[in-house]
Amino acid sequence: MDISNYVDNFYFDEKIASAFELGEVSTVDLLTLDITELERRTHCSQSELLQLIEQISLLLQPVRCSASKVTSKYLTTGDVKLDETLHGGIPVGQLTEICGESGSGKSQFCMQLCLMVQLPLSLGGMNKAAVFISTESGLETKRLFELARYLPERYPKADKKDIIIKNPGDRVYTILCPDLESQEHIIQYQLPILFNRDKIGLVILDSVASNYRAELRYNRSKSHFRDLDNIAKRGNQLGKLAMTLRTLAHQHEAAVVIANQVSDRIPRDYDAIGLFSLDYQSQWFSGWDDTDPNPKIPSLGLVWTNNISTRLALIKKTDSATNNSGRIFRVVYSPNSPRLDVRICIGSVGIYSC
């Protein structure tokens, strides 16, 4: 039974455990199926099943919290205008996605946050370490050290002892996960251990779509039912990933930032498919609409979109009058701020509003 995925150190009677394995009953099945159906599939008594359901329900129920006890914490982006746009910065205890096409500055933004989290509370940091989980290439440490050298320019009025980080890489844990199996192992098992050993304030996953695209892409040579099975499997894996990261973020008061890839968005004839179709409605939560010159759509679909709290987009734009290219930092949706655009630049100091 998969109860260990939801509750740590839960004692499970071996007899009942084997009965659940033979009956292929999951934790979700135990909590949702009719008691007579559970009896039929596990051959356990009704009293045993009801007792188990009560125990697990108590362990999984959310902790009561009144609105007066809720406190919002944020991690600074390193730029005053971006922080104001986000109503404080990157929210702590939530999942934040940063999406954009190749070369838009996603990795730059993530590395910048790895430095910001090391800053003291007085500067909007958390005085904690960062975890950088990469799925495509290792962390660009040369660029990380360059950003650290230019921190005095970003904070000219701050006390130098607060902003000079001699060894910025010492408080950035990094690992390369080239496949989905290693990624799941790191996040499910090793990351919680690291949280207990050190003060972690930020987790970066760059990027979330890479391994899922590689291992669960559609195989047109196989049957349609196999494709549907892959889609369902990917949806379950994405839900589990989001739940694990969200739980860690909430328990340890950490910010979680996930970089996501995008693909081209093909405009459709909405008169034919209707205004309530997903293609039309997705303009309001994808980050691009049909008025953009080259509309994109974030990877991993609606399942992933429903699992993140905040979506940010880095958009490349070219001025038709001057033919000059620029970048836009867009708040697509967030519980803390409305949809807004800020023009940004990338330089030696990192990403800043301009």
UniProtKB/Swiss-Prot annotation:
Keyword Nucleotidyltransferase found: no
Keyword Zinc (UniProt): no
Pfam families cross-referenced by the UniProt entry: Rad51
GO annotation, biological process: DNA recombinase assembly; DNA strand invasion; double-strand break repair via homologous recombination; mating type switching; mitotic recombination; reciprocal meiotic recombination
Residues that hold ATP according to the record: 100-107
GO cellular component: cytosol; nucleus; Rad51C-XRCC3 complex; site of double-strand break
Principal cellular location given in the protein's record: nucleus
The entry's keywords: ATP-binding, DNA damage, DNA repair, Nucleotide-binding, Nucleus
InterPro entries named in the record: DNA_recomb/repair_Rad51_C, DNA_recomb/repair_RecA-like, P-loop_NTPase, RecA_ATP-bd, XRCC3-like_C
Entry's Gene Ontology molecular function annotations: ATP binding; ATP hydrolysis activity; ATP-dependent activity, acting on DNA; ATP-dependent DNA damage sensor activity; DNA strand exchange activity; double-stranded DNA binding; single-stranded DNA binding
Record localization: Nucleus
Role: Involved in recombination DNA repair and in the repair of gamma-ray-induced damage.
Family classification: Belongs to the RecA family.
Record-given protein name: DNA repair protein rhp57
